[in-house]
């Protein structure tokens, strides 16, 4: 977990230095983004692990050449370390899907990545108009299924979505509420998604998951954490089950879903996949929703999952997936640079003091090469 540090003076006897303040929290963020231990970083910059620890804690001031070495190894310009972290992503604000099976190193990398994305978004918000954050708060007092169902329906009503039909653009619903969806979570099978509720609300999705119906469910699952679990440590069986139930109820409201499901044969896969096309949810989520609502019994539920396992849908993915919906908010904002505002993508990168490669890794956007500026040529007199 990244702790708040105080700035220290950079030690240098060089004639020029970009800035003399060093923030250790930024060093920890950059190191964790690269998944390096303090010892590994120390070896790469020819320092001791103890010195790295003291620099991150704000106790020891690094020399300028060490700051430059940090930047070269971690992929940041030296000036990156001379600014305070305005919006640090703390562990208690973050929710990880499949958190219990994930290594702390991976979770630390994702939190660091999210903090860096927050820096990008903060700059973009100073240049462009973003949707105001409008996440309703429906904390659970009892944690019952009926309470979660009520929270999901209340959230739909708050956003004026109604509870009588499916959602056509699931990601857009949350982005209109000011939640930034980032589609390139670190490449891992241990975490499906990640979210954070704070001054900048974000949902990260796993780019290795190729199922749009699973993405829809993951967005709503993380949305459930944002709506129900603000300020609460998540990752327990209880909070994960509540978020799953929220996602199911938000995607497929009880009354409308029950009506549609009852119009066909519960044992007919053609009916299940027709429901999938209509509700933009996976067949697995539909079967589970039907079981939770008492529309099928335990025997039918277990038979359905056995059939899905036999077809290898749980491993290779289901057929008849809905069309993929690319998140829009962050991409549109970055595309607007250099057109709607004078600041270009490379200007933004330089303001953040990321290297071009780091900017691509953080945002998923390649920095275009700077245009060559031609100087006027003064002809020789003849």
Task: Report the location of each language-model feature.
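Active-site hotspot residues in diverse enzymes, especially metal/ion-binding acidic/histidine motifs
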Residues: 1-382
């Amino acid at each position: 977990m990244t702790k708040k540090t105080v700035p220290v003076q950079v030690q240098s006897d060089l004639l020029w230095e970009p800035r003399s303040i060093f923030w250790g929290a930024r060093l920890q963020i950059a190191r964790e983004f690269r998944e390096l231990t303090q010892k590994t970083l120390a070896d790469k910059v020819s320092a001791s692990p103890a010195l790295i620890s003291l620099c991150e804690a704000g106790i020891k001031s690094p020399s300028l050449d060490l700051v430059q070495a940090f930047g070269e190894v971690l992929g940041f310009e030296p000036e990156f370390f001379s600014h305070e972290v305005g919006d640090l992503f703390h562990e208690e604000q973050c929710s990880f899907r499949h958190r219990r099976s994930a290594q702390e190193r991976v979770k630390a990398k994702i939190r660091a990545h999210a903090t860096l994305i927050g820096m990008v978004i903060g700059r973009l918000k100073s240049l462009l108009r973003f949707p105001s954050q409008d996440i309703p708060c429906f904390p659970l007092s009892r944690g019952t299924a009926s309470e979660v169902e009520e929270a999901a329906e209340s959230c739909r009503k708050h956003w004026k979505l109604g509870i009588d039909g499916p959602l056509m653009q699931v990601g857009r619903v949350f982005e209109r509420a000011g939640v930034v969806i980032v589609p390139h979570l670190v490449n891992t099978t241990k975490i499906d998604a990640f979210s954070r509720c704070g001054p900048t609300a974000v949902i990260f999705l796993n780019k290795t998951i190729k199922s749009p119906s699973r993405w829809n469910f993951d967005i709503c699952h993380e949305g459930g954490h944002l709506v129900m679990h603000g300020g609460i440590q998540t990752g327990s069986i209880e909070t994960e089950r509540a978020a799953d139930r929220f996602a199911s109820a938000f995607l497929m409201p009880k009354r409308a879903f029950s009506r549609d499901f009852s119009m066909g044969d519960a044992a007919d896969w053609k009916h299940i996949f027709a429901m999938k096309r209509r509700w933009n949810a996976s067949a697995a989520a539909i079967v589970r929703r039907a079981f939770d609502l008492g529309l099928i019994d335990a025997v039918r539920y277990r038979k359905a999952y056995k059939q899905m396992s036999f077809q290898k849908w749980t491993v290779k993915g289901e057929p008849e997936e809905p069309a993929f919906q690319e998140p829009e908010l962050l991409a549109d904002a970055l595309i607007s640079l250099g057109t709607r505002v004078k600041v270009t993508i490379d200007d933004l990168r330089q303001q953040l003091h990321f290297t071009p490669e780091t900017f691509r890794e953080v945002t998923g956007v390649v920095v275009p090469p700077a245009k060559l500026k031609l100087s006027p040529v003064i002809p020789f007199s003849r």
